[in-house]
Amino acid sequence: MTDQKLAKAKVIFVLGGPGSGKGTQCEKLVQKFHFNHLSSGDLLRAEVQSGSPKGKELKAMMERGELVPLEVVLALLKEAMINWLTKIVISLSIRYPRELDQGIKFEKEVCPCLCVINFDVSEEVMRKRLLKRAETSNRVDDNEETIVKRFRTFNELTKPVIEHYKQQNKVITIDASGTVDAIFDKVNHELQKFGVK
C-alpha cells in the first residue's frame, strides 16, 4: 500500500547507463520545473560518508560494483521523500529503480511514478564520460574495472525495468549523445505529454 503522506507526489524515474548524463539532466529538471532530485546513489554515498557501520558495509559493496539490497535503498528514498514533503514538495525526480523489483516495490509501498525518462547512449560514450569524471571525482566506482561491472549490471537488471514501463506507456527514451542543452530540450518537450510544464 502506498504511503498516504506521499499520495500527491509527482515522481519521475530517471534511468540510463552509468555516464549517460542522468545527474546533469536531473539538475536541469530541478532548475526548470522546481523538482527535488533524489539520487539513490547520492543517498548511499552520504550514508558511506557518515562513517556509520552501515556506511562502511555499503562502501565495500559499492567498491566491488555490487548492488545494494532493495530494502536499504527503498528505506533511504522513502525517508528522504517524507523529509522533503515537510517542506511542501510534490515533485521528485529519482534516479531509480535499477531493477524491476525496485520499481514495483517503490510504487506499491511509496507512490506511483508519473513517467520514466530513459537516457540512451552508447557504452563507448558513457565510458569516456566516466573516465573523464574520474579525473576530478572522489567516487569509488569511477574506475575501469568497476565501470565494466556497472555496464553489465545496467544491461542485465535495468533494461527489464524500461521494458516493464514501456508496456504502461510511461517511458520517454531520449538520445543522450548530444549536448546537455539539446538533450534537455528533448526532455522538456516529452515531459509536456505527461502534463509537466
Curated annotation (Swiss-Prot):
Amino acids binding ATP: G19, S20, G21, K22, G23, T24, R133, G178
Pfam families: ADK
Main location: cytoplasm
Keywords (A to Z) from UniProt: ATP-binding, Cytoplasm, Kinase, Nucleotide-binding, Transferase
Catalytic activity: AMP + ATP = 2 ADP
Gene Ontology CC terms: cytoplasm
EC number of the protein: 2.7.4.3
HAMAP family: Adenylate_kinase_Adk (MF_00235)
Name recorded for this polypeptide: Adenylate kinase
Lineage: Eukaryota, Metazoa, Spiralia, Lophotrochozoa, Platyhelminthes
